[in-house]
């Protein structure tokens, strides 16, 4: 392996907006601020909501007189 061409791989701290702190290693070289993590992401916490866009699709089809595919 060539010497002096690889970036420094240092320990960094990733802090989430929920307050969770994750220690990891990275070539970024500075601490990271995260918006979401595994502790607060809706998919992992079970608070995920399904957005129903059926009404919008029907309104679009009605507006542009596209026959329904059902």
From Swiss-Prot:
Alphabetically ordered keywords of this record: Metal-binding, Ribonucleoprotein, Ribosomal protein, RNA-binding, rRNA-binding, Zinc
Pfam families referenced in this protein's UniProt entry, alphabetically: Ribosomal_L31
Domain of life: Bacteria
GO terms assigned for molecular function: metal ion binding; rRNA binding; structural constituent of ribosome
Entry keyword annotation includes Methyltransferase: no
InterPro entries: Ribosomal_bL28/bL31-like_sf (IPR034704), Ribosomal_bL31 (IPR002150), Ribosomal_bL31_A (IPR027491), Ribosomal_bL31_sf (IPR042105)
Names of required cofactors: Zn(2+)
Bound cofactor: record note: Binds 1 zinc ion per subunit.
Binding residue positions for Zn(2+): 16, 18, 37, 40
BP GO terms, sorted: translation
GO cellular component: a single term: ribonucleoprotein complex
PROSITE patterns found in the cross-reference section: RIBOSOMAL_L31
Homology family: Belongs to the bacterial ribosomal protein bL31 family. Type A subfamily.
Function: Binds the 23S rRNA.
PANTHER family for the chain: 50S RIBOSOMAL PROTEIN L31, CHLOROPLASTIC, LARGE RIBOSOMAL SUBUNIT PROTEIN BL31A
HAMAP family on file: Ribosomal_bL31_1
Protein name: Large ribosomal subunit protein bL31
